[in-house]
């Protein structure tokens, strides 16, 4: 189980860490990252699993009394575009280890900035079989068109975590995760600081 930094985990006590430290030199830029689920994000139906303690922390942040996260559906997100609304969007799921690393950082920054974030759980039943990123799901196909080439490989596949800024029904900018294997390595302090910098810049747009 990964050891979280104290300032991010004041609400919980976790056991020792069994992961190695991530290489902080392996990163992605603001709008791109690796599309390999073993090094940079969870693909649709990929084996992305974590401990129950990690998953519980993720869910606790979503349901805290002061949470900045507002639950939404893919259908809701499509309507934001169609109605030319402005929102901050976070796509993820509880067992995605990269989502778990990003969540407390995004949570703290959103609270500091008094920003609400629309959260879409792409695996509502917490299983890979329930993943909504299915090419047979017309809402997902529509969302792919609206978000554009998120993965940077021309496939329009959506990897998580995904944080995007929608202004007047258009994607202004977005951020994926840093490029490291969150299944086996612990996020470093320098990577946490990089996440903070990028998120602060993104949420100002």
Describe the role of every protein-language-model region.
Residues 18-20:
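Bacterial signal peptide processing site
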Residues 100-113:
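Typically the conserved alpha-helix immediately C-terminal to a functionally engaged Cys/Sec
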Residues 91, 115-142:
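Thiol-based oxidoreductase modules, predominantly thioredoxin-like and allied folds used
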């Amino acid at each position: 189980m990964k050891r979280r930094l104290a300032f991010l985990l004041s609400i919980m006590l976790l056991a020792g860490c069994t992961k190695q430290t991530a290489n902080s030199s392996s990163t992605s830029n603001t709008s791109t990252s690796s599309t390999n689920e073993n090094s940079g994000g969870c693909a649709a139906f990929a084996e992305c699993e974590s401990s129950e303690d990690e998953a519980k922390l993720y869910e606790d942040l979503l349901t805290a009394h002061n949470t900045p996260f507002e639950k939404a559906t893919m259908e809701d997100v499509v309507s934001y575009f169609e109605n030319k609304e402005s929102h901050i969007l976070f796509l993820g799921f509880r067992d995605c280890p990269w989502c778990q690393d990003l969540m407390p950082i995004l949570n703290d920054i959103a609270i500091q900035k008094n920003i609400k974030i629309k959260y879409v759980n792409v695996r509502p039943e917490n299983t890979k079989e329930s993943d909504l990123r299915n090419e047979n799901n017309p809402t997902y196909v529509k969302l792919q068109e609206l978000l554009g080439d998120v993965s940077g490989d021309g496939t329009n596949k959506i990897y998580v975590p995904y944080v995007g800024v929608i202004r007047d029904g258009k994607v202004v900018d977005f951020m994926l995760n840093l490029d490291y294997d969150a299944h086996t390595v612990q996020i470093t302090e320098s990577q946490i600081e990089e996440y903070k910098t990028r998120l602060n810049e993104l949420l100002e747009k």
